[in-house]
Amino acid sequence: MQVSVETTQGLGRRVTITIAADSIETAVKSELVNVAKKVRIDGFRKGKVPMNIVAQRYGASVRQDVLGDLMSRNFIDAIIKEKINPAGAPTYVPGEYKLGEDFTYSVEFEVYPEVELQGLEAIEVEKPIVEVTDADVDGMLDTLRKQQATWKEKDGAVEAEDRVTIDFTGSVDSEEFEGGKASDFVLAMGQGRMIPGFEDGIKGHKAGEEFTIDVTFPEEYHAENLKGKAAKFAINLKKVEERELPELTAEFIKRFGVEDGSVEGLRAEVRKNMERELKSAIRNRVKSQAIEGLVKANDIDVPAALIDSEIDVLRRQAAQRFGGNEKQALELPRELFEEQAKRRVVVGLLLGEVIRTNELKADEERVKGLIEEMASAYEDPKEVIEFYSKNKELMDNMRNVALEEQAVEAVLAKAKVTEKETTFNELMNQQA
C-alpha cells in the first residue's frame, strides 16, 4: 500500500492510496473460496462447485465488494499510520480499476484543528456573592401568593398591578392600522406586554371612561410600517380588577408540600429552593463568563462537517419542542442554527482540549453530588437517585456534566476571578 497526504484547503485533507494488484487478487480469491463453500448451483453438491464456475458467476460482484472493503480498511490503516484525526464522514473518490493492475483511489475529509490553548491568564470572571435574605424569602412568598391570587372588580382608578378589560382602536395619521383594534381585551398591568406609554395612559382612569392616549412605536418594532410612528389609541375602559391575595393559611401552605401547614415550614422550604436556584445561577454565571473568555482568547478553525452535524441536532431539538417530525426538522433553514451550531462546536473543541491537557476524568463524587442536587427538587429524591443509578445513558450524561464543570474549574484556576456582592433578584434577572 502506497499512501500520500495533501492539504486541500484549511482543514481539508486528501489521502491518495494505491493498492497492489497482487493484494487485490489474493483477497478476491480468498472471498471466492468462501462463496464456493456456501453457494448452491444445480448439478453440484453444496461446497463442491468448481472454482471456475464460481468465478464466472460471482467474480464481478465479489471483486466489487472486495475493492470496497479494501478501500475502507486501507484508509483506516493509512490514517492510523499518518496519525490523522478525521472529523466527519470521509468521501471516497475511486480511480479507474483495470484487472491485474494496481488500484489507486483518494479519500477526502476534514481533520480536527490542532488546538493550543492560550490567553487563559487574561480571562476575567466576576463571581457573584449572594445570600438569600429574609426579605428575599418574603418577596418569594408574595410571588407565590400572586400566582394563586383571584381577581375582584373595583370602582377605583387603575393602579400599577391591576387588571383591566378594554376595547381599543389604534390609528396613525388618523388612519387605523392592521392589528391595532381589539374588543374585550384583558390586560394585566405591569407585565410589559404593550408598547411603552400604553399602560401609563390607562393608569388613573376608572371603569366606564372613554379616552384617547398618545404613544410612539419603538424604532425596533416588528411591523415595518409602524416603526417610530406616533399613534393614538381610543380606549373604552370597561372593567378594572384588583388582586386578592390568599392568606397564608394551613390549607394554602399544604399545596406546596409543607405537611405541617406552618408558615415557618413554608419559609424553610422556600429558602431551601431559593438557595438551590442560587447555587445553580452562580455556577452558570461563572461558567458562561469562563467559556466566553476561552472562546474570545482562542480563534480556531472549525470543521464544516461538525457544524453540519450540530445543525442537524439543533433542528431535531427544535422540531421536538414544537411537535414536529424528523422530516420537518431537516427542512428547517440551516441559517437559523448555523451560528449557535458553530459556537457549540468551538466550545466543545476548546473544553475537550482543556480536558486533554489537564488529563481530567469525571469525578464520581461530583457526579453523585450533581445527581443528589438535581433529585432534591423532586418529591421523592431517593427514587430519582435510584432511577439514575440504573440508567447507563443518564449516568453517562451526568458524567459529561461533571467533566465539563471540572474543565471550567481548570480554566478558572488560571483566570482572573474577582468577587462582587449582589442580590438574589439582581442575579436572577441577569439569568432571565
UniProtKB/Swiss-Prot annotation:
<dbReference type="InterPro" id="IPR008881">
    <property type="entry name" value="Trigger_fac_ribosome-bd_bac"/>
</dbReference>
<dbReference type="InterPro" id="IPR005215">
    <property type="entry name" value="Trig_fac"/>
</dbReference>
<dbReference type="InterPro" id="IPR027304">
    <property type="entry name" value="Trigger_fact/SurA_dom_sf"/>
</dbReference>
<keyword id="KW-0963">Cytoplasm</keyword>
<keyword id="KW-0143">Chaperone</keyword>
<comment type="function">
    <text>Involved in protein export. Acts as a chaperone by maintaining the newly synthesized protein in an open conformation. Functions as a peptidyl-prolyl cis-trans isomerase.</text>
</comment>
<dbReference type="GO" id="GO:0061077">
    <property type="term" value="P:chaperone-mediated protein folding"/>
</dbReference>
<dbReference type="GO" id="GO:0005737">
    <property type="term" value="C:cytoplasm"/>
</dbReference>
<dbReference type="GO" id="GO:0044183">
    <property type="term" value="F:protein folding chaperone"/>
</dbReference>
<dbReference type="GO" id="GO:0003755">
    <property type="term" value="F:peptidyl-prolyl cis-trans isomerase activity"/>
</dbReference>
<keyword id="KW-0131">Cell cycle</keyword>
<dbReference type="InterPro" id="IPR037041">
    <property type="entry name" value="Trigger_fac_C_sf"/>
</dbReference>
<keyword id="KW-0132">Cell division</keyword>
<dbReference type="GO" id="GO:0043022">
    <property type="term" value="F:ribosome binding"/>
</dbReference>
<dbReference type="GO" id="GO:0051083">
    <property type="term" value="P:'de novo' cotranslational protein folding"/>
</dbReference>
<dbReference type="InterPro" id="IPR036611">
    <property type="entry name" value="Trigger_fac_ribosome-bd_sf"/>
</dbReference>
<comment type="similarity">
    <text>Belongs to the FKBP-type PPIase family. Tig subfamily.</text>
</comment>
<dbReference type="GO" id="GO:0051301">
    <property type="term" value="P:cell division"/>
</dbReference>
<comment type="subunit">
    <text>Homodimer and monomer. In vivo most of the ribosomes are in complex with monomeric TF. Uncomplexed TF, however, is in a monomer-dimer equilibrium with approximately two thirds of TF existing in a dimeric state.</text>
</comment>
<keyword id="KW-0697">Rotamase</keyword>
<dbReference type="Pfam" id="PF00254">
    <property type="entry name" value="FKBP_C"/>
</dbReference>
<dbReference type="GO" id="GO:0015031">
    <property type="term" value="P:protein transport"/>
</dbReference>
<dbReference type="InterPro" id="IPR008880">
    <property type="entry name" value="Trigger_fac_C"/>
</dbReference>
<dbReference type="GO" id="GO:0043335">
    <property type="term" value="P:protein unfolding"/>
</dbReference>
<feature type="domain" description="PPIase FKBP-type">
    <location>
        <begin position="161"/>
        <end position="246"/>
    </location>
</feature>
<protein>
    <recommendedName>
        <fullName>Trigger factor</fullName>
        <ecNumber>5.2.1.8</ecNumber>
    </recommendedName>
</protein>
<keyword id="KW-0413">Isomerase</keyword>
<dbReference type="Pfam" id="PF05697">
    <property type="entry name" value="Trigger_N"/>
</dbReference>
<dbReference type="InterPro" id="IPR046357">
    <property type="entry name" value="PPIase_dom_sf"/>
</dbReference>
<dbReference type="Pfam" id="PF05698">
    <property type="entry name" value="Trigger_C"/>
</dbReference>
<dbReference type="InterPro" id="IPR001179">
    <property type="entry name" value="PPIase_FKBP_dom"/>
</dbReference>
